[in-house]
Amino acid sequence: MFSLVLLTILAIDWEAVRAEPVLEKRAQRALDFAQERLTEARKHYESGDDAAFTKAVNGTAEGAEYCLASLAAMGKHPSQNVRHYKPAEMRVRELLRRITTLRNDASIEQRPAVVESERRLTAVHETLLDGVMSKRPRS
């Protein structure tokens, strides 16, 4: 029963993120969503609920990827939009630290889901960092 209620709340939360019309806020909310999912993944890990754990870990990567897509949809080169890219990069770096700790704590059965999400987060982080550190395009 509790998981059904939790699943409903999560679906509403994700829909609220996707419905945000302002791209900058959408990117921030997507990272908020990712952080909440990682916190929930830790709780599910401690309680032993493997299905909810896997879903929460995957939600973390989805949120970070959606943040990157929202930032890219702004249409500006990242070096011209550092105000939004750099905070996103820092928050994804924090997510990477947290998911690495979770990977080290997770059991061997749970580890593949965490490793896959960590790989996806690393890809998002590298894309954000490359964008921030790249030179401005010539006009």
Regions found by a protein language model. Give the residues of each.
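Sec-dependent N-terminal signal peptides of Gram-negative exported proteins
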Residues: 1-11
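Long, charged/polar, soluble alpha-helical segments
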Residues: 9-139
